[in-house]
Regions:
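Acidic, glycine-rich calcium-binding repeat modules characteristic of RTX/beta-roll
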Residues: 62, 138-142, 146-147, 170-184, ...
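Acidic glycine-/aspartate-rich tracts in secreted/extracellular proteins
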Residues: 47-49, 97, 107-110, 136-137, ...
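Low-complexity acidic/polar repeat-biased segments
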Residues: 221, 305-309, 317, 321, ...
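Active-site scaffold of zinc-dependent metalloenzymes
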Residues: 44-47, 118-144, 319
Length: 521
């Protein structure tokens, strides 16, 4: 018979997603009986004279005195869960036997050298937790990023109804490919702390290895799979981080450096790497929870600075709009929303998603990729490569020899290319327009610098009062020197453009020659 607690236990069916179900303790959770948020009371049990129930398990039912530091750390761990789920924790005072969650402070002898145990909802001794101060180096919870803090968040996950991804606790399925509790990260490497704090492989284990002794560099929040699971049970905290928030990438390996999963309920938000002293990777895509679609991205995409044992992933359904890179060589990736992506100094690669993005490379030789959407791509100083892809994009090369590139990977289609504006084409700076033969399939020009004379023509006249579109020319690339329009004339002298058409306008209407192009195989 389960221990009596303030709240009743309810149960939800499994979701059908093994990466959520694998960390659900059979779907059991503490029910609020319709009130919102779910209010869960807790008590620090620190009196050896308290008459706590002796009937649950083989572990100590007396507790050592909790220190203020230990209490504060556990409260921070509770707050980490309350930040993401529709839960409100209430401290009802020390030594309250009836509290839903009762927290023991024990030692190695009392806990057989185990770091922590928490009985999940619906089990004998439900809500009773044991934290081993000795096994955790003298502090029961420690600082964020330490193994002690990981244990605190992990055990509180059990307290709320979560299970391990490596075993069948509560009837949960094991994560695909996981063969043991330690060291086995399973298919796609998803059994590790960067994706779920319920794993026994803390931190970014597959990249950084075992860092349990550092005192930093592990996860400090529930991670993407944990957040999805706990929100399935209790609902979302839609009041957390509703303003315009900035998340700064950790830039130093020190106490407090950690990985965290961003749960943000609103506002226009930014991941900022400007303080980093090395290359950064920033990816604004959220954890999809779908391995078939996104592989390991189901558990989130890691944003971090090179050599630093900390960073961010983004929880499912969270929108982070903007990214700011460092002054080194960064990789910045946008999402499906309207992003403002800034590279700053360094030779950066910046790629937008499906939204209408503004992408600014800053100083350095950058590669800017717009993808779907009507994007604004700004090279800044340096020799940049600018790729718009689909959408009607605006290209601003800035100072330096820039390449405005067109290569969709397939034959030219207007929807794939759009009608772009090249704002500042400057031959004297070495600017070029690069055309791929895999896209501009009618070109006869050999790969290399310059179009063949037969492939390029300049139009200066009107036909029947409309701009000459190249319908009467054999050239495949036709430039209208009156208005800066640049056409792909796939059909040559035949009527119409075939699948081609206007693909760019050089708004400064420069002089253009066949030598201003590069042909790519």
């Amino acid at each position: 018979m389960a221990r009596a607690t303030t709240l009743p236990v309810a149960q939800k069916p499994l979701t059908g997603n093994v990466y959520i179900d694998g960390i659900l303790w059979g779907g059991k959770y503490y029910s609020s009986s319709g009130s919102s948020p779910t209010k869960i009371d807790y008590s620090f049990w620190n009196s050896t004279s308290a008459s706590f129930d002796n009937d649950y398990g083989n572990y100590a039912t007396t507790s050592n005195t909790w220190t203020p530091q230990g209490k504060d750390s556990l409260i921070k761990a509770l707050d980490a869960w309350a930040a993401v789920a529709n839960i409100q924790f209430e401290n009802v005072g020390d030594d309250k036997q009836s509290a839903t969650l009762g927290l023991y402070n024990v030692n190695n002898a009392q806990l057989d050298d185990t770091l922590g145990i928490f009985n999940p909802p619906g089990e004998d001794g439900q809500g009773i937790g044991y934290l081993n101060r000795e096994g955790l180096g003298g502090s029961v919870a420690g600082t964020p990023g330490s193994l002690a803090f990981v244990v605190a968040i992990h055990e509180l996950g059990h307290a709320l109804g979560l299970a391990h991804p490596h075993d069948n606790g509560g009837g949960s399925p094991i994560y695909p490919g996981v063969t043991s509790p330690f060291g086995s990260t399973g298919n796609l490497g998803l059994n590790q702390g960067i994706y779920t704090t319920m794993s026994y492989n803390p931190g970014f284990y597959s990249q950084n290895g075992n860092q349990n002794e550092l005192g930093y560099g592990l996860q400090s929040t529930p991670m993407a799979f944990d957040i999805a699971a706990i929100q399935y049970l209790y609902g979302k905290n839609n009041s957390y981080k509703t303003g315009n928030d900035t998340y700064y990438l950790p830039s130093v390996n020190q106490s407090g450096t950690s990985y965290s999963c961003i749960w943000d309920a609103g506002g226009i938000d930014t991941i900022n790497g400007i303080s980093a002293q090395s290359d950064v990777t920033i990816n604004l895509n959220d954890a999809s929870l779908n391995t078939a679609q996104d592989g390991a991205g189901a558990g989130g995409y890691v944003s971090s600075a090179k050599g630093i044992f900390g960073g961010f992933t983004i929880a499912n359904s969270v929108v982070i709009e903007n990214a700011i890179g460092s002054n080194f060589n960064d990789r910045v990736i946008g999402n499906e929303f309207n992003n403002n992506l800034v590279g700053n100094d360094g030779n950066d690669t910046i790629e937008g998603g499906a939204g209408n993005d503004t992408i600014n490379g800053g100083n350095g030789n950058d590669r800017l990729i717009g993808n779907v959407g009507n994007d604004r791509l700004i090279g800044g100083a340096g020799n940049d490569v600018i790729v718009g892809n689909a959408g009607n994009d605006v290209f601003i090369g800035g100072i330096g020899a820039d390449i405005f590139a067109y290569n969709t990977g397939v034959a030219f289609a207007r929807a794939d290319v759009g009608q772009d504006t090249i704002s500042d084409f400057n031959r004297s700076q070495g600017d070029n327009i690069r055309l791929s033969k895999s896209t501009f399939t009618a070109l006869s020009s050999a790969p290399g610098n310059g179009l063949a004379a037969s492939d390029f023509a300049i139009a200066t006249l009107d036909v029947l009062g409309t701009p000459l579109t190249g319908e009467f020319l054999n050239a495949k690339i036709v430039y209208n020197s009156r208005n800066g329009s640049l056409y792909y004339n796939e059909n040559g002298r035949a009527l119409g453009f075939g699948s081609g058409g206007l693909f760019a306008t050089l708004s400064n209407v420069p002089t253009l020659a066949a030598s201003d192009f590069i042909v790519q195989a």
